[in-house]
């Protein structure tokens, strides 16, 4: 469920439109104007996605009735699905912003941070499974939390790379 929205925001039309616009501003108006545009877009998108995610997380049972109506017949399965979807939906906001930050860095010819960001997901998933190997009957909640944490970690990673490069001064 969160991956559907991630594809729309992080890999979909929004990012496809953002990168050429940012690159054109960078070329035509200069770094200052392009970065002001990027900072505004990131701030607006971050707030919008946070509010959207908050709404979806609150009303996740209703969404799950539409997405997985057969699960309602087994209370435990429906409850687990809602719980895991709520946790993993946290991933949407930071990973969508990661795509924008990566697009900014890529526009400057800086590819390393974005290319290495998915490694954080793998490391966090592996470490969480090793660390919590014997503490839970099912690994689903551990992996869901690890996915959410990895989204935040990737966002911090890319934000720091942008700051070191001088691509992001502040979020508006």
Predicted regions and their residues:
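Membrane-embedded alpha-helical bundles of multi-pass transporters/translocases
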Residues: 1-172
């Amino acid at each position: 469920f969160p991956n559907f929205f991630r594809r729309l925001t992080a890999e979909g039309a929004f990012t496809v439109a953002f990168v050429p616009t940012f690159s054109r501003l960078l070329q035509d108006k200069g770094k200052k104007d392009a970065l002001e545009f990027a900072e505004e877009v990131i701030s607006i998108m971050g707030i919008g996605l946070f509010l959207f995610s908050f709404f979806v997380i609150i009303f996740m049972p209703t969404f799950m009735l539409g997405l997985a109506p057969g699960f309602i017949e087994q209370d435990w399965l429906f409850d687990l699905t809602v719980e895991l979807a709520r946790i993993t939906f946290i991933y949407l906001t930071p990973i969508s912003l990661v795509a924008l930050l990566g697009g900014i860095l890529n526009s400057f010819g800086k590819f390393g941070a974005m290319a290495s960001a998915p490694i954080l997901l793998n490391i966090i998933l592996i470490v969480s499974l090793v660390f919590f190997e014997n503490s839970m009957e099912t690994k689903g909640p551990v992996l869901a939390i690890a996915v959410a944490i990895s989204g935040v970690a990737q966002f911090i990673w890319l934000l720091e790379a942008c700051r070191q490069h001088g691509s992001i001064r502040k979020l508006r």
